[in-house]
Curated annotation (Swiss-Prot):
Gene Ontology CC terms, in alphabetical order: plasma membrane
Subcellular location(s) of the protein: Cell membrane
Origin superkingdom: Bacteria
A Pfam family matched in the record: MFS_1
Transmembrane segments: 31-51, 69-89, 109-129, 157-177, 186-206, 225-245, 255-275, 290-310, 316-336, 347-367, 377-397
Outcome (variant: E219K): In strain: RM220-3
The name this protein goes by in its record: Membrane protein MosC
Keyword terms of this UniProt record: Cell membrane, Membrane, Transmembrane, Transmembrane helix, Transport
Organism of derivation: Rhizobium meliloti (Ensifer meliloti)
Gene: mosC
One example GO MF annotation: transmembrane transporter activity
């Protein structure tokens, strides 16, 4: 449930929080929602463009696997650091300004990565890329939560669906359609983003602030916040593991080509998009607790199907079902963490963002280590366990529907 405190209903407070041309006029409503959705789309698009270009970067600089691992660790460190600082920057400089800067810096850093004339410039670009990604991840969720607080209770899952759509677009732009010309493609990507952003980003919500912006150690003793963090971590472990290992699993088991092996992740992503687009309405209809329980069960059933169905079509159906099950977990966790009465919105979002991003990073190597010992198929049983844990954890979520207070 999205809890809205009484102050958000006060006319004077609403006017202060929502800029002119914001969500109180019909054209402004559409433009504000579109602007925030475009942020999520950019995030998925640029992240996928980078991920599919990693082999090119490795070959261009002759990195070995260990050096590439260090490189990704440096990028992750920058992301985690600026995730932690994003709330502070938003508090000091304003949400709209920082959201715009991070959203434009992210694709700009991608151009610098491909155009870097030497290794030192490349390393600086990687740090900048990670920092922009981390800050943008937190800030765009601030904007999403602000929309929920200003009359759009069914929006978080849809916005995360826009991110998944961006991921598909990034895979198509940089992974499927040819090879080479990375600088030209990244510049074209940045130019398109700048053109659309010039029109949309002035309509982002401004002054999205929430009092305390520092994560105090004492707040980590909050059991519900810790639970949200653990669930965010496990959910993103699964996302990272499927992104990395689903293709290899199908290639090994079904003896298919690289292109055909990619269909597993495509099926996963397509059903995730479908689930997120409809997720807010489903949550409104059946309640948060029921949706979490169903999602965890679908995820476990999907991974079980993908592992044990003998046919290739059956395995694809399993990955699709897994994507449907995973679709609404992150949006709900983020929304609930930002709605807690015992910690500020900024602290809740920052904590679950850091936990989730950490899970996405460590998920593939965790599965890889387990696979070395017991085989990839058995290692992926871990994802079935994640679904069971999520379904059991549904009892800690409110059972009420959106807009209905918990009795």
């Amino acid at each position: 449930m999205t809890r809205t405190s009484p102050r958000h209903h006060a006319p004077s407070e609403t006017k202060r929080r929502v800029p002119m041309g914001g969500v109180h006029t019909n054209p402004g409503k559409k433009l504000t929602i579109t602007a925030v959705a475009f942020q999520f789309f950019i995030n998925g698009l640029v992240l996928a463009a980078w991920a599919t270009s990693i082999p090119h970067v490795k070959n261009a600089y002759s990195f070995n696997d260990a050096e590439l691992g260090v490189l990704l660790l440096i990028m992750a460190a920058g992301a985690l650091l600026f995730m932690s600082l994003a709330g502070y920057f938003s508090h000091v400089f304003g949400s709209r300004r920082m959201s715009i800067q991070s959203a434009l810096l992210f694709p700009s850093a991608l151009v610098l990565i491909f155009a870097a004339p030497n290794c030192m410039t490349f390393l600086c670009s990687i740090v900048l890329f990670g920092a922009a990604n981390g800050a943008m991840d937190v800030l765009m969720n601030h904007q999403a939560k602000a929309l929920e607080e200003n009359g759009f209770p069914r929006i978080m899952a849809f916005l995360h669906g826009c991110s998944s759509t961006g991921i598909l677009a990034g895979i198509m732009t940089f992974g499927v359609i040819g090879d080479g010309h990375y600088v030209a493609r990244s510049v074209t990507l940045l130019t398109g983003i700048l053109i659309v952003a010039r029109w949309l980003f002035p309509h982002l919500l401004d002054d999205v602030r929430s009092g305390e912006h520092r994560l105090a150690i004492g707040e980590l003793r909050n059991c519900k916040l810790l639970m949200f963090g653990i669930l965010s971590f496990l959910t993103m472990v699964t996302d990272g593991a499927i992104a990395e290992w689903s293709k290899l699993y199908l290639i090994r088991v079904e003896q298919v080509t690289d292109q055909v092996g990619s269909l597993g992740y495509v099926a996963f992503t397509l059903l995730m998009i479908a689930g997120r687009i409809s997720g807010d309405r489903v949550k409104d209809a059946i309640g948060c607790r029921a949706l979490i329980a169903i999602s965890g069960s679908l995820a476990s059933a999907g991974m079980t199907t993908a592992l044990f169905m003998p046919s290739f079509a059956g395995k694809l159906a399993g990955f699709a079902l897994l994507g449907l099950g995973m679709a609404n977990l992150v949006p709900i966790i983020f929304s609930e963490a930002a709605s807690m009465n015992t910690v500020s919105k900024t602290v809740g979002l920052t904590f679950v963002s850091v936990c989730g991003y950490s899970g996405f990073l460590v998920g593939p190597p965790i599965i890889g280590r387990i696979a070395e010992a017991v085989g990839l198929g058995r290692a992926l049983l871990f994802i079935i366990a994640v679904g069971v844990i999520v379904a059991c954890a549904s009892v800690f979520f409110d059972r009420h529907r959106s807009g209905q207070p918990e009795p």
